[in-house]
Amino acid sequence: MSITNTIYSSKMLCWLYCKVSQLRYLGFKQEVERRSRLDLFDYKGIAKPLPKCYFEINTDNNCFGIGWSLRQYAGVKKSYCNALVEHGYFFGTYVQEVEKKTFTKNLLTFGDVRKAHIEAVVKDKDVYPIGPYIHYAPDYYDEERFAEEKKRLGRTLLVFFSHSGTGESVSFDLDALIERINSIRKDFQTVVISLFWSDINPEIEKRLKAEGYLIFSSGHRYDYYFLSRQKTMIKLADMTMSNSTGTHLAYCSYLNKPHWIVRQEIKTKALNKAGEGNMAISEMMSKDVVNQQENEELYQAFAEYEESLTNEQKRVCDKYFGLSYIRTKEEIFSLIK
């Protein structure tokens, strides 16, 4: 067993690992809280790098504020969830090593499809679908500030660009995507582009601003207000759009926002060993026939520009993302206490 898997399998070692990271970065929480007071569109301040500082002893739960959001929702007082939550939607039969090795008994995911894939591999855990995680995140803005922002933006198109993984860069035909965005731009007062924190660079900023687009980022992957910002931004939008499938589709559909996927070839490049590892996993997943079938079903469902979600789109999203599996505060409490 590798050192990493040894840590995953021991609650005490996971706890110690977290404590060491907290001692190394004593100002982490203060910095995250400071960023939580920034304007939603202050993407440069929100998307600055953060160190790898863990408070959730199940490491996946530190990503995007998933563990923090569940604890806020359920009123759990301790500093971690006693369950492992898949940090995003994985298409196909792939199951992370941490899910197989974790010390915890409960695994949480989106819907029945993922539940079945996990249970086919992990025999000694209980798997519970809880629907789109964004439901459990608190809003970034209160009602008054939200109303002010919506008035300022007017009718809004929100576009999610396909993003890189850890240690990777991502590229696609930006000119072609902008052409498709502009083909429906007349229907909106504001166009907002959502960029992952590590994909922001002067070249892309200049190009998007030249088109008159606003730039938004949900923040760093370890910023526990990530989902809160994303939730508020999606709620501010009237239409959503992307150039690939992904977890954003679960969140947009759950928040009842129409979505259009402009399918593009997405190219990734490894920047370091972490990137090489992630690309190897992505390549393995892409060869999975089930992965291909699941992605294709979603691409087909969202291939056309529609001004509202169709019944077929809702059905497909419920199938994969568990829209009907939203849990009460009491239910979440019992799963993560």
Which residue stretches match the model-derived regions?
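Short active-site oxyanion
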Residues: T102-L107, T190-V191, L236-M239
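Carbohydrate-associated surface elements
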Residues: Y133
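Short His-Asn-centered micro-motif
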Residues: L108-G111, F160-S162, I193-S198, S218-G219, ...
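Conserved catalytic-core segment of nucleotide-activated headgroup transferases in glycan assembly
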Residues: P138-I204
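C-terminal non-catalytic accessory extensions
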Residues: T102-N106, V113, I118, K319-K337
